[in-house]
A protein has these predicted regions:
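Secretome/extracellular-domain signature
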Residues: 1-90
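A residue-level signal for beta-strand positions that form part of recognition/binding surfaces
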Residues: 27, 33, 116-118, 144
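Short Cys/His-rich Zn2+-coordinating modules
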Residues: 96
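Short, P/G- and charge-enriched loop/turn segments at secondary-structure junctions
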Residues: 131-135
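Extended hydrophobic/aromatic segments used for targeting, binding, or gating
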Residues: 124-127, 151
């Protein structure tokens, strides 16, 4: 860009942790020149009396607009309900700036899951088993913009 005008930088928030479906991350932008969408939170998997296995995962963010080089975010691993008393929370996608949060297995007592280890990474999934109190998923990492100025 030659002779750019002043631009407003907006850093998107990471997805919010919940015991149900995860919250979506919000958009990071550099004025109208660059838009980076936030990732989507995973839907909560539902137990099924007829299925031995049930699961769901969050989709990675869509690709950036206005970037010379860019790519869409990756998907995390699926959270799985294995039986009425056993489940495994999904692990989040990594970014170039940090590791995604881990999703532990679930057998009582449950522990809360990992938050993102860096900007742009996802938070680990939440999990619940039977009548045990659900473990909350981890928070996603906030967005990031790096500006290099050359003269």
């Amino acid at each position: 860009i030659s002779g750019p005008t002043s631009q407003t930088i907006t850093i998107g928030a990471g997805g919010t942790p919940t015991t149900g479906a995860g919250g979506n991350g919000t958009t990071t932008s550099f004025g109208a020149l660059l838009t980076l969408p936030g990732g989507t939170g995973a839907p909560a998997p539902t137990a099924s009396a007829s299925a031995a296995l049930s699961g769901s995962y969050g989709a990675g963010a869509g690709g950036p607009t206005g970037a010379d080089v860019g790519s869409a975010g990756g998907n995390g691993t699926a959270g799985l309900i294995l039986a009425s008393s056993s489940a495994l929370a999904g692990t989040a996608s990594n970014s170039q700036f940090g590791q995604g949060g881990a999703g532990p297995g679930a057998n009582a007592p449950l522990s809360s899951n990992g938050s993102a280890g860096g900007r742009g990474a996802g938070g680990g999934g939440g999990v619940a088993v039977g009548s045990v109190t659900a473990a909350t998923g981890g928070a996603g990492g906030a967005g990031l913009i790096i500006v290099w100025e050359y003269s």
